Amino acid sequence: MIIPWQDIAPETLENLIREFVLREGTDYGAIEISLQNKIDQVKTQLEKGEAVIVFSELHETVDIQLKAKF
């Protein structure tokens, strides 16, 4: 189920994005980018509709995915 990012409290959204970018395996290329820049990039993708927040009822987990993949 897609959860609109606008329905999530700002602090919760920030924490969700932070957890997402800190996951092992999240690759931003050869150039090191600051944590805040990574968070800002993901938030921009959510705002533009390029990424979505997905809740899995089966696993009771939340994830951020590219809209094209979902």
Curated annotation (Swiss-Prot):
For this protein, the record's InterPro entries field holds: UPF0270, YehU-like_sf
What is the superkingdom listed in this entry's lineage? Bacteria
Gene3D superfamilies (UniProt xref): YehU-like
A Pfam family reported for this protein in Swiss-Prot or TrEMBL: UPF0270
Which family, according to the similarity comment?
A: Belongs to the UPF0270 family.
The record's listing under NCBIfam families reads: PRK04966.1
What is this protein's record name? Answer: UPF0270 protein VP2791
Task: State the organism of origin.
Answer: Vibrio parahaemolyticus serotype O3:K6 (strain RIMD 2210633)
